[in-house]
């Protein structure tokens, strides 16, 4: 007999994810103080979110979110036809909820558009029987450990999800790219430099250089000109 599968509400999942994300501390110390999750489980969560296998980073946010929305699902399930009691379609949930969440948060998980279509998750469920098909076996073991804990301790689903989101927020903070701020000077300083540059007589050459540079800058900034070209000087700096 075919076991029934569950459908996870996309709207509920998005709302809960937004709510928990807002509360996520993003700091290890705060997370430890609040969660009461065993250290080995917390460490496995941290390793999964920072996994070198990009696909694995999407697993815990997706699977645990489903468990938070519908406690009767088996959060190890990947496919609705996995054969597990409480099976659901994790790929659809990830694509509709977790992937958009990733995109609006600087692609912190990796920017994948369909992570559950990649080889590591072309399996019916995240169970140890599928370990042999995985290249990153240690990373897969971490996923199994966390999801097994969630199944054996279903009341911890929200805490596990919050812990996962804290790890994601911390990853985002640590991987944030800081761009160098270009040096800038005031208008007065610019005019002073131009005055000093033009003070020496050069037969109009320096004035031409300044004018060309200004037109090039204006053209690039406001997209006014395709090209700026200068011709030979045929006038002196000042009339004689």
Predicted regions and their residues:
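Interfaces and regulatory segments of ATP-dependent nucleotide/adenylate/phosphodiester-chemistry enzymes
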Residues: 2-3, 12-190
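Short helix-onset patch at the extreme N-terminus, typifying the N->h transition
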Residues: 6-8
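Hydrophobic/aromatic-lined pockets within catalytic cores
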Residues: 169, 198, 216-220
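Solvent-exposed, charged helical/coil patches
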Residues: 191-211
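Catalytic centers of nucleases
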Residues: 206-240
């Amino acid at each position: 007999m075919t076991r029934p599968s569950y459908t996870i509400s996309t709207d509920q999942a998005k709302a809960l994810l937004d709510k928990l994300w807002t509360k996520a501390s993003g700091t290890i110390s705060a997370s430890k103080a609040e969660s009461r999750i065993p250290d080995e489980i917390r460490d496995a969560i941290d390793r999964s979110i920072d996994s070198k296998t990009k696909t694995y980073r999407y697993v815990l946010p997706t699977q645990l979110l489903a468990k938070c929305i519908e406690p009767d699902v088996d959060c190890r399930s990947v496919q609705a036809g996995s054969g597990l009691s409480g099976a659901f379609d994790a790929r659809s949930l990830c694509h509709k909820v977790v992937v958009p969440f990733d995109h609006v948060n600087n692609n912190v998980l990796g920017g994948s558009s369909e992570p559950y279509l990649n080889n590591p998750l072309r399996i019916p469920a995240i169970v140890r029987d599928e370990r042999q098909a995985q290249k990153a076996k240690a990373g897969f073991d971490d996923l199994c450990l966390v999801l097994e804990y969630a199944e054996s301790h279903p009341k911890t689903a929200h805490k596990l999800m919050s812990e996962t989101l804290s790890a994601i927020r911390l990853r985002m903070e640590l991987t944030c790219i800081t761009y160098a701020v270009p040096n800038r000077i005031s208008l007065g300083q610019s005019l002073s430099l131009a005055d000093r540059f033009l003070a020496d007589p050069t037969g109009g050459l320096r004035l031409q250089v300044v004018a060309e540079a200004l037109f090039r800058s204006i053209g690039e900034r406001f997209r006014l000109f395709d090209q700026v070209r200068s011709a030979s000087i045929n006038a002196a700096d000042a009339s004689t």
